[in-house]
């Protein structure tokens, strides 16, 4: 599948808390070209991995009665959704994609994601460990595009946002000859760049 459009929670004027607004403001003061996290293979995780508009990087969905697995070419990432409605285990460690469980509401797959890892360093995407994400997936038939998956998002994160925020994505079926390949992106480059950028700022202030 490939993405046809996406609207991320951070678009427009996000309802940031004062603490999150400070982190966002620090990032916005940097060079938007040189300080783009994607240049440093920053793995954003959920919900942004599902909201990417990188049309040249396809994804694959594998579905069984008990699981839905999604494999993304972009950054070689994947996520697993357990279709059992059970909450995340208490001993689960936070991760960039969190722990996702789902139930069916007629023809709509309702996914709840918790156990998300903190992202409170400078970047366009901020998230705390208190974040909870709800997705609603629905397959529709478009006269021109064919099979589409429409996805509505809502993220609740009291550390980052003052109210729930929403996003939307539409995936369309890729051509039969499209293959999900490897991206091969080095890790930890962005965090090193953040440290270097902060050091430059401190040196310039002296």
Task: Name what the model sees in each region.
Residues 1-206:
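PEST-like low-complexity, intrinsically disordered acidic/proline/serine-rich tracts
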């Amino acid at each position: 599948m490939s993405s046809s459009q996406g609207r991320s929670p951070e678009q427009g004027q996000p309802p940031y808390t004062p603490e999150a607004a400070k982190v966002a403001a620090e990032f916005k003061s940097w060079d938007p070209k040189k300080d783009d996290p994607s240049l440093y293979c920053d793995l954003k995780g959920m919900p942004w991995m599902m909201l990417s508009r990188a049309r040249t990087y396809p994804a694959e969905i594998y579905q069984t009665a008990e699981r839905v697995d999604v494999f993304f070419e972009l950054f070689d990432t994947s996520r697993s959704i357990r279709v059992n409605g059970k909450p995340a285990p208490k001993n689960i460690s936070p991760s960039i994609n969190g722990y996702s469980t789902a139930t069916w509401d007629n023809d709509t797959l309702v996914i709840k994601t918790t156990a998300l890892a903190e992202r409170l360093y400078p970047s366009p995407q901020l998230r705390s460990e208190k974040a909870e994400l709800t997705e609603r997936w629905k397959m529709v038939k478009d006269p021109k595009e064919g099979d589409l998956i429409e996805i509505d998002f809502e993220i609740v994160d009291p550390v980052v946002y003052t109210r729930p925020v929403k996003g939307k994505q539409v995936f369309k079926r890729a051509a039969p000859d499209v293959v999900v390949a490897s991206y091969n992106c080095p890790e930890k480059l962005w965090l090193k760049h953040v440290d270097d950028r902060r050091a430059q700022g401190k040196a310039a202030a002296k």
